[in-house]
C-alpha cells in the first residue's frame, strides 16, 4: 500500500469516527429535548419549559462559539455541563404516567442508541485509530457532566439531594479508579452497579428513569472501562499528575480523605439507633469499629510516610533532571519498591476492615450510608492500586563495587609486574574507571567503592569483598542486586592476579556469596573485562542454588595489524557502558568480525529470580519504625497473609518453562530489570 493510500485510509477512518461521535451527541440532544417536552406536556410545570428553552439557548450559544469563534473548549464545556444537568433532570423528573407515552418511549430508544453509538465509537477508536493516551486523572468533559448531574440533584428534597451528591462523588472516584487501572477497579464497578440498581434508589423512595440513568452512566464509564484493557501507559505515566505534584498539595489531599473516612464512620454509627437487634449490633460495631480505627490510623500514617519519601525523590529528581533521569528510576534507587510492597498489604487490611464494618453496619433504608460507602471503597482501592503498581513496577535496589588494576601485567608464573611509566597511559585504565563510575551514576547504583591500585593484596580484597557482599539498605533488607566489576590481568583459568603472586578464584567469591546470601534471594552480577573470562562464564552455568551471572568478553587477534589497533583491557568496558547508558549509541554486538565480542553466562536458577518480597520480619521492622504500639497486633495478620500462595502449582510450571527456555535458547540480550543488559555476540 502506498503512502498516499495509507493517508487516505487514515482520513476516512478519522471522518468515520467523527461521524459516530456527532451522531451519538445528536441523538442525546434530541432525546433530552423530547424528554423535557414530554414532562412539560404531562405536568404543565412552567419551570420545566423555562429549563427546556434555556437548554436550547445554551446549545445554540455553544454551536456559535464552536463554529464562528473557534472557542472549542468553552463551547464543549457549556455543552457537557448543561447536558449533565439535563440528563439529571430526565432521571429525577419521572412518573408512572410517562411509561405509556409514545414520545417517552421514543426518548428512551434515543437514549439507548446514544450510549450504544458512544460505546461503538470508543471501541472503534481504540481498535483502529491508535489513540494517544494522556496521563489524566479525569477529563474536563467528565468532570463537567458530573457537576451538572450533581446540580440537577438539588431538585430533590435535602436528605435525598445529599445522598445523590455523595453518589456523584462516588462515581467520580470510580472513574478515576478505572483510569488508574487499580486491581480492584472492576470489583468496585460491580459493587457500585449492584448497590445503585438494587437498593440505593429504593432507599430514597424516588422513581428514576432507568434509560436516562443508564445512558448517563454508560457514556461516562465506557471510555475508562475500555482503557483498563487498551491503555498502554505505564504505572508512573498514569500516576504522573499525582507523583509530580507539589509536597504541600499532596499532604493537603490527606485532609479531605480523612474527613470522608470520618464521615463514613459516623454514618456507620447510625446503625446503633436500631435497637431491634441491639445484642448483635452493639458488640459487632464496637469490635469491628475498633479494628477499623486501628487500621485507618495505619492507613493515614502510611500515606504520610509515602509523601515524605516521594518528596525526597522529587528533590533528587529536580537536582538530576539535566541528566535525563526519570522519577521511577530514582524511586527504585531510594527503596520505594520495598516500602510500597509492605504498604500495599497494610492498605489491603484497611480496605477489608472498611468492607467488614460496612457489612456489619449495613442500613437498607439509609441512602447516604450507601453513597458514602461507595465513595470510600474506590478511594482506598486507589491507594492500594498505587502501592501495588509501584511495588510491582519499580526496580530493586542495587549496589556496585569496582576493582581496576591498571599498571601491571602477568608474567608466566602469575606474578604481577609493574610497567614502565610510558606504557601506563596506553592501558587507559583511568578512562575505564570513569566509564564504570558513569554506569553506576547513570543507573543510580549505590557505589560501595572503586579500587584503583597495583598493590591490592588477596587478604585486603577478601575483606573488602566480604564487606561489600554483606551490605544492606538503609531500611534494613539486603540489596536486590550486587554488581562486582573487575578489570585487570588473569590466569588462563580466569582467576584474578593480585599483588604478591596471589590470585582470587571464582569459588572464593561464590563461597562468600553463599554465606552472606543464605537466607535471602539477592543476585550477584560479575562483570569481567579480562583476557580470560570465558572459563568463569562456563563455570557459572553449572552453579545451583544461587542467582549469579557473569558478563565477560573475548579479545580476538587483529587480522590486519597495520590498519587496526589490537584490543586492550578497557575497550570492552567502554563499549558495554556506552551500550547500557545510551540506547542510541549504535553499538551492535551481533555484527561479524568484531575484535571485542561479548559473552555471558547465568546460573541454573537465574530465571526463577524475583525481586525480594517483604518477609514477616521486614513487616515487623517496618511497623516498629513508622506506627504506634497500639497497632502491633495486626502484625500477626500481616505475617499470615504473607505466607499465602494460592497459585503455587501454576508458579512451579512457569518456573520450569522459564528454566528450559533460558538454558536451551538463551537470548542475545538479557535484561536484568535494573537498566543493565547482559549481552553476547
Curated annotation (Swiss-Prot):
Subcellular locations according to the entry: Nucleus membrane
InterPro entries xref list: TMEM168
UniProt-recorded name of the protein: Transmembrane protein 168-A
Bilayer topology term: Multi-pass membrane protein
MF (Gene Ontology): sodium channel regulator activity
Organism in which the protein naturally occurs: Danio rerio
Keyword Electron transport: no
Record field: transmembrane: 16-36, 47-67, 73-93, 135-155, 156-176, 184-204, 252-272, 281-301, 346-365
Primary location recorded for the protein, binned into one broad class: nucleus
Function: Plays a key role in maintaining the cardiac electrical stability by modulating cell surface expression of SCN5A.
PANTHER family listed in its UniProt record: TRANSMEMBRANE PROTEIN 168, TRANSMEMBRANE PROTEIN 168-A
Glycosylation: residue positions: 517
A GO term from the CC aspect: nuclear membrane
Keyword Membrane: yes
